[in-house]
């Protein structure tokens, strides 16, 4: 029995634990899981190993960090270090997107190294296997794709991206109308290239019932990939993106009927003014399914600083209802991220999530803001560091540029606004 099915009968211990952490009633949370409005990614064999994480309606915004090798840079030890660094700095989940080295061994090592849910994109592995046989990626058949999915589920991944919603109709829109950047989803491009080469419908769409059987057997959460996500703000909200969204909504219904948890992936590069509409449309078409967005990135001209751009878009998206933010690092569009990039990406995305939760009136966010305000009023620097999203950086600044008076900082010194006012109030007494 899957967790979704359990929640239709009772309140599982996993759900009770999440409810306590989130400050919601267990019965309400179980109902949302049963309805598909909240997902709890945890493979059937890993429920006791993975820290339970709820993603969706009424819960704090969660963040994901991507790690993984490439054909250019393949250091499994580094990827394990990156995964641990991401979790240490507050990532709620990790995805292994490896395309270089022993993919299965890397996946298993990352799953063993962290205690949060781990996701993957199996079609990458299917493509890599074809390349290693000296053949083109498009030479794979549907069995190659499905075997990769099955293998990842057998290995115990908690959630996986499956690009099942890109159909010939959506692909035709791209080919006929054109796009500034075509298809930028790596998994989406692999599937689309296969469809073009074989002049055939997406085998992941046509075999979705079989994928559901596998997911139900292992209780793996499906993350319905957005192959047609815009890679430029110029391509946002075009016909192809919307056609795929409609199919994602159809697949959400089929997942729920099968008792399989599902979330929906979204863009991508989207102008700031269009982000609220993107979220509202997804929530309507997909009947409240958890929304997992990459960014969104609201401008194309910030290479090297895309973690900042994505945090801006992510805060807007999350405030309007996105549930799950995939981090973007400073290396996005440029190179494989290193540990420092991963940390910066996680911190930027945590800021976006906290800003959104503050605006949404989440109690934990208000409490943390109140505690920080109190620490600042008291000029309690150690407490401020404890409350900071990243305690190390503010402590470093203060130690590197110390003030003359211990209770002040080197920005204002004796002209500190708080101290001036407090002294005046004390004198008045």
Curated annotation (Swiss-Prot):
UniProt binding sites for [4Fe-4S] cluster: 409, 412, 416
Cofactor: [4Fe-4S] cluster
Residues noted as binding substrate in the record, renumbered to the chain: 66, 95, 124, 163, 185-187, 226-229, 265, 292
Enzyme nomenclature, EC number: 4.1.99.17
GO molecular function: 4 iron, 4 sulfur cluster binding; carbon-carbon lyase activity; zinc ion binding
Known pathway: Cofactor biosynthesis; thiamine diphosphate biosynthesis
Keywords attached to this entry: 4Fe-4S, Iron, Iron-sulfur, Lyase, Metal-binding, S-adenosyl-L-methionine, Thiamine biosynthesis, Zinc
Residues annotated for Zn(2+) binding in this entry: 269, 333
Keyword Repeat: no
NCBIfam families: PRK13352.1 (NF009895), thiC (TIGR00190)
Name of the featured protein: Phosphomethylpyrimidine synthase
Lineage: Archaea, Methanobacteriati, Methanobacteriota, Methanomada group, Methanopyri
């Amino acid at each position: 029995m899957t967790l979704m099915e359990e929640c239709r009968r009772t309140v599982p211990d996993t759900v009770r634990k999440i409810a306590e952490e989130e400050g919601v009633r267990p019965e309400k949370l179980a109902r949302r899981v049963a309805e598909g409005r909240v997902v709890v990614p945890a493979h059937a064999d890993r429920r006791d190993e993975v820290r339970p994480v709820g993603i969706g309606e009424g819960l704090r915004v969660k963040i994901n960090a991507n790690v993984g090798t490439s054909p250019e840079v393949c250091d499994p030890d580094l990827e394990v270090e990156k995964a641990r660094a991401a979790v240490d700095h507050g990532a709620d989940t990790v995805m292994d997107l490896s395309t270089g080295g022993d993919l299965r061994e890397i996946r298993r090592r990352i799953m063993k190294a962290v205690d949060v849910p781990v996701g993957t994109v199996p079609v990458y592995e299917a493509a890599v296997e074809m390349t290693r046989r000296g053949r083109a990626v498009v030479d794979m058949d549907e069995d190659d794709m499905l075997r990769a999915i099955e293998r990842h589920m057998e290995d115990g991944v908690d959630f996986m991206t499956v690009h099942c919603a890109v159909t010939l109709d959506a692909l035709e829109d791209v080919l006929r109308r054109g796009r500034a950047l075509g298809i930028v989803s790596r998994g989406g491009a692999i599937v689309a290239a296969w469809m073009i080469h074989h002049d055939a419908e997406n085998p992941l769409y046509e075999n979705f019932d079989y994928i559901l059987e596998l997911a139900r057997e292992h209780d793996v959460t499906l993350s319905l990939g957005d192959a047609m996500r815009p890679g430029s703000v110029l391509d946002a909200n075009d016909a192809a993106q919307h056609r795929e969204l409609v199919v994602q909504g159809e697949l959400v219904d089929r997942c729920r009927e099968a008792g399989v948890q599902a979330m929906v992936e979204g863009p991508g590069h989207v102008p700031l003014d269009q982000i609220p509409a993107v979220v509202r449309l997804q929530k309507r078409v997909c009947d409240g399914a958890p929304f997992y967005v990459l960014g969104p990135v609201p401008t194309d001209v910030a290479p090297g600083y895309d973690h900042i751009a994505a945090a801006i878009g992510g805060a807007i998206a999350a405030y309007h209802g996105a549930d799950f933010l995939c981090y973007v690092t400073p290396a996005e569009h440029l190179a494989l991220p290193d540990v420092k990039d991963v940390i910066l990406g996680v911190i930027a995305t945590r800021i976006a999530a906290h800003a959104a939760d503050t605006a949404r009136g989440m109690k934990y966010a208000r409490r943390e803001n109140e505690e920080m305000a109190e620490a600042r009023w008291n000029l309690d620097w150690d407490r401020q560091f404890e409350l900071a999203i990243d305690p190390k950086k503010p402590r470093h600044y203060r130690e590197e540029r110390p003030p003359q008076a211990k209770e002040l900082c080197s920005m204002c010194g004796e002209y500190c606004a708080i101290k001036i006012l407090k002294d005046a109030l004390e004198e008045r007494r």
